[in-house]
Amino acid sequence: MVREGEERIGNRVSLGVIGVSYRETTLQQREQVLHILQQAQGSFRLEVFQEEKDYVLLATCHRVELYSVAPAELFDSLAQEIELLGVSPYFYRNQDCFAHLFCVAGGLDSLVLGETEIQGQVKRAYLQAAREQKLSFALHFLFQKALKEGKVFRAKGGAPYAEITIPILVDQELRRRQIDKKASLLFIGYSEINRSVAYHLQRQGFSCITFCSRQQLPTLSMRQVVREELCFQDPYRVVFLGSSELQYALPHSLWESIWDIPDRIVFDFAVPRALPSHTVFPHRYVDMDQISDWLREHRKEVNSAHLHSLREVAYRYWNSLNQRLERRDCVGANA
């Protein structure tokens, strides 16, 4: 749904994005920024603005961002709150906001350069926001065009091939720890990252893979267990946590037994982390901070020509948006 009576983007109101990524922050800092931005969603109805502002919250393993059409004061307020954490957030407005999201969707701003998962993450964040709010035309336009051009960019071979990915790194870590391919692996949560790791390991010969989800998954080719039947006393050698809501979705008594199996390894892909840091055994626990460090060691440099090409496309769409808004203003004035 598109919100009616949208205020024209100009000096007072910007189409902007504020956020942090793997470049500026640790995992713990991104968790703290996510908390601030989640709280900000509830405070967008401010008396000074006298209307509810729209937003899209994009939270992934390596970035936390809030996109909105809002006054500069709102972005400034969020930036000041984030800076109290000792973090310097980035803020892009108008055409630079377009260029940023186009590069994100195209995989050029990812820690895993050229990754495809970010396209789906951007789409899901946009669709969730569209279901819950009456988004402005500008936000609809921004996300729809960024998703479209991200696909086109990949189809034309603009996005580099990601040689080192999270599934590959997980596979390497299991080999380093000499995990037998007949070992029992448990994936809790049917998230995209859990699925990509599970299918990669299956292709590498791991044959005892179990998924645990809120409900039965009829098309899954792997073993399944529903949450009500989950027991950490079962001999799962490796456990993969794919969703931050698991910390509260599963009973505390169940979590207490996650370390009971000797030498069990836990991969926590969630942001915020599914397991609080004070409850883990460091030598048996891998979170996204450690994975990010591994990925940095293998990260390729962005091709400047690819970056320039995608930004130019974004700028053209920004100009197109302004032309459309001008036509809407003219139609409204003549009505």
Swiss-Prot record:
**Gene3D superfamilies listed in its UniProt record:** Glutamyl-tRNA reductase, N-terminal domain
- Could you name the active-site residues? C61 (nucleophile)
Lineage, top-rank taxon, reads: Bacteria
The answer to whether keyword Oxidoreductase applies is yes
EC category name: oxidoreductase
Residues engaged in binding substrate: T60, C61, H62, R63, S110, E115, T116, E117, Q121
Q: Does the keyword Oxidoreductase apply?
A: yes
User: What GO biological process term is on the record, naming one?
Assistant: protoporphyrinogen IX biosynthetic process
Checking SUPFAM superfamilies in the record gives: Glutamyl tRNA-reductase catalytic, N-terminal domain (SSF69742)
Keyword annotations for this protein, in alphabetical order, are: NADP, Oxidoreductase, Porphyrin biosynthesis
EC number(s) reported in the record: 1.2.1.70
Residues that, per the record, bind NADP(+): G189, Y190, S191, E192, I193, N194
- Copy the pathway line from the protein's UniProt record: Porphyrin-containing compound metabolism; protoporphyrin-IX biosynthesis; 5-aminolevulinate from L-glutamyl-tRNA(Glu): step 1/2
Q: Which GO terms describe its molecular function?
A: glutamyl-tRNA reductase activity; NADP binding
Residue numbers for the site described as Important for activity?
H100
Give the reactions, separated by semicolons, that this protein catalyses: (S)-4-amino-5-oxopentanoate + tRNA(Glu) + NADP(+) = L-glutamyl-tRNA(Glu) + NADPH + H(+)
What this chain does, per the record?
Catalyzes the NADPH-dependent reduction of glutamyl-tRNA(Glu) to glutamate 1-semialdehyde (GSA).
The Swiss-Prot or TrEMBL record describes its family as follows:
Belongs to the glutamyl-tRNA reductase family.
Tell me how this protein assembles. Answer: Homodimer.
What's the miscellaneous note?
Answer: During catalysis, the active site Cys acts as a nucleophile attacking the alpha-carbonyl group of tRNA-bound glutamate with the formation of a thioester intermediate between enzyme and glutamate, and the concomitant release of tRNA(Glu). The thioester intermediate is finally reduced by direct hydride transfer from NADPH, to form the product GSA.
The record's domain comment reads:
Possesses an unusual extended V-shaped dimeric structure with each monomer consisting of three distinct domains arranged along a curved 'spinal' alpha-helix. The N-terminal catalytic domain specifically recognizes the glutamate moiety of the substrate. The second domain is the NADPH-binding domain, and the third C-terminal domain is responsible for dimerization.
NCBIfam families on file? PRK00676.1 (NF001909)
Protein name per its UniProtKB record: Glutamyl-tRNA reductase
Gene, per the UniProt record: hemA
